A protein has these predicted regions:
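Cell-envelope/glycan interface and biosynthesis
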Residues: 1-158
Length: 158
């Protein structure tokens, strides 16, 4: 499989990979989604609009999201065998258990384990150190910049 990013995001992602390898040589980053054309964004939005899951997909009529600029990545960490580390939910799980804002509470309630929380924290540490920003509602999603900055400096992928 292939994933595409804007060169600025690809450079930052390589930095995140190197930071992870420096701490955990047997780990690697695993990419689930990267650049996404607006035509695909519209199809995704059509599936969730009018449902309780709409908040997890950027509305294309509002300019879409950072995936549509090649500046966002959905990512996790894999072990030496290529198996994703446990993070408490699957990627694209559209529920509060995916949010990063209340992870301590999720552990207390038994919705995720302490190890899953620590794995999420490790992912955030390497991604943030490389210049990415975490999305509060999705532990796997990272943006290179703000939406306003993307609109000013980059082009949408159609």
């Amino acid at each position: 499989k292939e994933a595409y990013l804007h060169p600025d995001a690809a450079k930052a992602l390589l930095e995140a990979h190197l930071l992870l390898k420096a701490q955990y040589p047997s780990y690697r980053l695993i990419i689930y989604d990267a650049a996404r054309p607006m035509s695909v964004q519209k199809k995704m939005w059509d599936v969730v609009k009018g449902t309780s899951k709409y908040m997890y997909v950027s509305n294309p009529s509002r300019g879409g999201g950072l995936h549509n600029y090649g500046l966002a990545v959905d990512i996790s960490i894999a072990d030496s065998l290529g198996h994703p580390l446990p993070m408490g939910t699957e990627v694209d799980y559209m529920d509060a258990a995916s949010h990063i804002t209340n992870e301590a509470k999720l552990v207390r309630e038994g919705k995720i384990t302490q190890q899953e929380r620590e794995n999420r924290i490790l992912l955030r540490q390497v991604m943030k150190s490389a210049g990415f920003r975490a999305l509060p509602s999705e532990w796997w999603h990272f943006n290179l910049c703000s939406r306003d900055e993307a609109k000013q400096k980059y082009k949408l992928i159609n």
